[in-house]
Amino acid sequence: PSVRAKRWDGKIRLYSKATGKLYRGLVPYVQHFCEKNGHTIILPDGLNRTGSVPRDDFSKFVDKILTKSLKIRDYQLDAFAHAINHRRCILLSPTASGKSLIIYCIIRMMTTLGKRSLLVVPTTSLVEQMYKDFEDYSLKAEDYVQRKYYGYEIDEKKPVVVSTWQSLATFDK
């Protein structure tokens, strides 16, 4: 309707002239541009919040939450630390590189901070795999993790929900 009414040309833009807003993920690029070109940028409080928790603190945290037989690899620890320190990021990791362990560490940190987590995976088999992996990593999954797909209902008390997007689409708001 907006296209037909000639209020919108159908293009999605990263900056909105109407609202004056920019996608938050672009802030570092705007900062870099401003620094490079000698411009001053003033950001609202909290917009550029990134943590500076030392890597050793993450290592100690991981040692506490994993079973003794599991060891986290350096690149997994780096990815975990990056995700927590930067709060918003995309982590790209190849097949069989231990993504589930990275996700587990992030979710355990969020749970420790009193936050709830929603993990959306593409298939029901991955819902089950993540649930089993969390048990293997030392979490008592039945107390903390809720699986959401056909046959399972949401337990509001559990801090972690693992679901497919299709199951969430049918979930009552």
For the regions a language model picked out, list residue spans one by one.
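Conserved pre-motif I regulatory segment
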Residues: 2-16, 33-36, 42-92
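A generic structural motif
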Residues: 16-26
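Walker A/P-loop
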Residues: 71, 85-110
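Conserved helix-turn-beta segment of the N-terminal RecA-like "Helicase ATP-binding" lobe
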Residues: 117, 124-152
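Conserved SAM-binding loop
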Residues: 72, 119-120
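Residue-level preference for the first positions of well-ordered beta-strands
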Residues: 88-90, 116-118, 159-160
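Conserved helix/coil segment N-terminal to the catalytic DExD/H
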Residues: 150-173
